[in-house]
Amino acid sequence: MKAKETYLSRDFRETAAQRFPAQAKQLNAAFDMRLNALLAENAGASKEKQYHLKRQILPGIAAYETLQRVMPKEEALQTVHGYVEHLAR
């Protein structure tokens, strides 16, 4: 089940390319694997809940968990928070 590209996944890929170019391919693959696993785990959710899970919640979790491979937890959290803040402006 391939997820539609969201602002979170787009911003994650941009961060990976700009800040971790040598690891970007592996980070993108790890992000995609984690996101697909999260989507599969939540496949039974209601249609209304699915929308929010697919567009924001699960991509945010996947980005946060994947970024922790290359940065401290707090920095990963602030990075993902920055994606949301940027969209809100």
Regions found by a protein language model. Give the residues of each.
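Hydrophobic stripe of amphipathic alpha-helices that form coiled-coil interfaces
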Residues: 34, 41, 45-48, 67-70, ...
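Long, amphipathic, charge-rich alpha-helical segments that form helical bundles/coiled-coils
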Residues: 82-89
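Short, charge-rich amphipathic interface segments used for partner binding and complex assembly
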Residues: 51-82
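A structural signal for alpha-helical segments
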Residues: 15, 19, 48-55
